[in-house]
Amino acid sequence: MELFRRRYLCLVSFVFLLSAFLLTLFSGVGKIIIGAAAIVGVIISAVFTIILKKEKFIPFLCGALCFAVAVNAFSSFVFISIPDSQAYSAVGENTVWVRVINPTGEEKYDVRLLRVGDKYVSIKSELYIDGVNDLEYGDELVFNAEIDRAMDKSDKSKLLSLTLSDDDRVFIRKAEKKNYFSIDGILSLSHDMQDAFSDHIDRVFGDHAAIAKGLLVNDTRDIDVRTDTAFKRSGTSHILAVSGMHISLLMGALDLVLRSIRVKKIIRIAIISIVALFFLALAAFAASAVRSVIMLYAVYLCYILYEESDSQTSLFISISLIVLFSPYSVYDIGMWMSFLATLGLLVVYPQFSEKMPYPKHKNRFIRYSLRVLVWCAKTLMITVVANFFLLPIMWYFFGSISISALPCNLVLSPIVTVLMPLCAITAIVGVIPYVGIPFVFASNKLIDLMMAIVNYFAEVRFGVVSLQFEFASVLVVLFMIVFSVLLVIKLKHKSMIFIPMGAFVLTFALCLAVFSATAKPELKCVRARGASTVFVLNGTECSVIDIDENNHSKGITILNGMSKYATEIDEYIIVYPSEKDVKTLETVCKNTVVRKVIIPKFLENKDLPIYYDIFKCAEKYNIKIELFDRGSDVVITENVRFCYTDENEIFVGNNNAYLATKDEELIYAYGDHSSVIPNEDRTYKKLPLN
């Protein structure tokens, strides 16, 4: 594919990004050492290249590469390592001076530490203050706090978390004026603009405002967990993250309007650039939106200067600029997902689309039918290419990949293409009496249709496939190596780039089929807060058994186990139904798919309210309910049965089973697989099978 051939800026940007990623793995001194070693290596390579090939441009290229690594090492050291060192040395109880830089929500604030004790610092942190929800940008606070490392792993730029040690010693100095002439001030202003526009959308769209805000301004705060999970499982999360698709649709629609009224090209570029910047501020400078707008500016600049542009170079430069001015963005998974998906659409997708013929049949019906088929094929290939470029991130960070994304994106593509500009128009004219009514009605109906499609594909059986299997890890690593090599070398036929994709799909499907057919059932016991939860794994199937009379909700425990073992729950068995089980079931259903809930038949009237709540929750999330008698066994998977009595829990397998009495800590075993909690006084016996 020769990705870097005659794209020297692209190569320099790649080296910059690669060094940015690698340097995050080392401490402050390590960054300088690694940066210096990389520069020495580049210089040595340049010397040998000049001696052997006598290329005149090589010294300039190598100088640019050295400069990229050096700048990145310096930037990473100053803007990451030094704040890290300051932050971790401040851990403990102390008096702090902070300034509010963003009121993110009720009683929750993004702040910058100005002083810890007698030491002046500049550290971004998060602060929660019970009962205080009227702070604004620029307000300063002084209080005693317990300083700890931040728990929010999704935003590593927030290094510390502050817990008030003494609520009575909080002193607040209100800001006399807002200083928007700083990075924090600009971000605060953009959040104020986003909040104001979000309030306007709330008034226009009503109950559908949460989705509309996600589509238009990247504001997903009001989207509930269940809806967010549905978008993730259906592989359509990109719809709610302002990115190149949103910029293309909205700016493309604006460009069509300007063309229709015969506006000159240079004026069109100026208008679209200003509107794009305003839109970027409304999106609170989300990384994917920043990348898209910088790419747009780069393309327009090339059109003005050279009448042509190179999209790959624009993409690499835009990401490099983001990392340069915001070093902590290297930790932003969303930015890298946006970058990789866009790279795939720019590099690999054209090799498919260019070979697709444009149907020109004499029969109009056949001609348009063929065009629809070609459009469907291109839409599917866009999803396939994007998912393969995202495969490393999906494997390493999420452990699963959505198969439902292929048909779901195919169905949603025309709907979203219409919905995006329609929502933008509705947001503008929706408050005008009578005029806005049809726009609001049409937008809300399209949102309902989109959500129905997303929810349907989110619940498709095996729509999400786990990548946690050992064979999956091997296949993903091999694919990454082969695919990366093919991207940078010269290929006789560029269509060869699709060979690793096909090979991965076929090999993975074969391995998964063999694994499902031959895997023995495993029983995993997970203990948390004194309660036990059993995961019964049989190939790709997973069942969960809640076997404790514990008063704590175990939703987080089950979800953590799910992330390791499976992507959905086939059967969820509740042995001792209680109020905590209702909360647990609600939490689990919001974050994953549960196919069936199995509970014992109730014996006393006092259990009726609990059973009513369980049935109501099952109806809400479209879950089947099954009741079983005490003493009877329930088939969990093909080879495992569960038996409940008043005395014990029994797990029965093909050849052997173990019993653990209810009064003791539990033993679970099947064949060679077992999870045993040590207890010297434990007694268990082997049960005969009928």
Residue ranges and their predicted role:
Residues 1-87, 163-165, 291, 486-491, ...:
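N-terminal leader/targeting segments
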Residues 1-26, 302, 366, 425-455:
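Hydrophobic alpha-helical segments
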Residues 11, 40-44, 55, 228-405, ...:
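Hydrophobic alpha-helical transmembrane segments in multi-pass membrane proteins
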Residues 32, 128-144, 171, 181-185, ...:
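Non-globular, low-confidence helical/coil segments that flank catalytic cores
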Residues 73-238, 602-604, 620-623, 633:
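Membrane-interface helix/helix-cap signal primarily in integral membrane proteins
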Residues 98, 145, 215, 243, ...:
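Divalent metal-coordination and catalytic microenvironments
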Residues 187-190, 194-205, 258, 369, ...:
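Membrane-interacting alpha-helical segments
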